[in-house]
Swiss-Prot record:
GO biological process: one example: copper ion transport
InterPro entries associated with the record: CopC-like, CopC/D, CopC_dom, Cu-Rt/internalin_Ig-like, Ig_E-set
Name of the protein: Copper resistance protein C
A GO MF term: copper ion binding
Documented effect of changing H72F: Decreases affinity for copper(I)
Span of the signal peptide: 1-23
The record's note on its domains: Contains two copper binding sites, separated by 30 angstroms, which can be occupied either one at a time or simultaneously. One is specific for Cu(I), while the other is specific for Cu(II).
Keyword annotations of the record: Copper, Metal-binding, Periplasm, Plasmid, Signal
Source species of the chain: Escherichia coli
Residues bound to Cu(+): M63, M66, M69, H72, M75
Length: 126
């Protein structure tokens, strides 16, 4: 194998290791779970695959539907967003108990690689 081929192979291996170390955070689980129907939760917990950079991560809660109202406009829900007990989690704590309806959680997660990853999911309060 020529020196050039060895250098290219070594460079490729180094880059592969570097890129695998820069994994983006993924939402691993949530409470309540996506598409679930639950009693009004006191908090919503989001659990990610990586430690979060709190300063740049966050979430918001929106009520997207209310029983008996066919044309309910989305309404932001007043809530506090805080780091979870685990550095890979965050919690959303609504200021008031959630009334029956459908809700969307929009989240933004940033880990040590500094790339923001966003997503959302819905759940229903019975």
């Amino acid at each position: 194998m020529s020196i050039l081929n060895k250098a290219i192979l070594t460079g490729g291996l180094v880059m592969g290791v570097a890129f695998s170390a820069m994994a983006h955070p993924e939402l691993k689980s949530s409470v309540p779970q996506a598409d679930s129907a639950v009693a009004a939760p006191e908090k919503i917990q989001l659990n990610f695959s990586e430690n979060l950079t709190v300063k740049f991560s966050g979430a918001k809660l929106t009520m997207t539907g209310m029983k008996g109202m066919s044309s309910h406009s989305p309404m932001p829900v007043a809530a506090k967003v805080a780091p979870g007990a685990d550095p890979k989690s965050m919690v959303i704590i609504p200021r008031e108990p959630l009334p029956a309806g459908t809700y969307r959680v929009d989240w933004r997660a940033v880990s040590s690689d500094t790339h923001p990853i966003t997503g959302n999911y819905t759940f229903t309060v019975k």
